[in-house]
């Protein structure tokens, strides 16, 4: 099950029926038709549970009977598509939800009453996500929430609603409509709180924390590996210089304070500067050992 499906199933499992949620779903997935008996309404979805939710919303909120039809999509995905269809009191339904325009179509914007009411806004965002929302799986590490709209002004209305909840929503116009999106993980988690998907929010945060912990460990390991590589490289340079001194002038001719450091470096090429400092008969600071190693390298360079 994808993360998007899990979020939608959590919302639908709460069995909340809302006029504003229904308004968003119809606005984003509905179409109006005309029959001999008047207007018809069809709402299309690939989610069987959402189709059932719509059926119950029509029945309990408006006492409208509808039917759920389905067919198999013929493209590569071959998903089953559900259509919730009704020809009962469609005009009354659209008028009550402030959805109908004067040309027997659906209004493209969002009603001002929804934009100005927090609870109505929550319900509308919930419906918008159920209809056309998606969240990239947090396991991917690339966080993105999208809500697709047919009309640009509707996408901008969705962005306005999200911004009222202090979410950094942006709108991108595409060839077929527009998309409202969030890209920050914190914004996506807050959105899940807004629509009441608390379990999904907790799951998202858990995955995010695990990923960040793994990344921190990897960075620490990479840094440690790089430090080891630098230590070995510096050690080998010094060892080569000590060998050069030994062959040309003999280590016994080095100043006494350098002889012990030179011997230790040859015996323990993998030691860090701190380990060398701790191993001297008279322990030194790291800077003290570094100073002596630089002296040894300088002597070798002058030979």
Curated annotation (Swiss-Prot):
GO terms for molecular function: DNA binding. Residues 272-303 bind DNA. It comes from the Bacteria. One of its GO terms (biological process) is regulation of sporulation. Keywords: Cell cycle, Cell division, DNA-binding. Belongs to the WhiA family. Involved in cell division and chromosome segregation. This is Probable cell division protein WhiA. It comes from Streptococcus pneumoniae serotype 4 (strain ATCC BAA-334 / TIGR4).
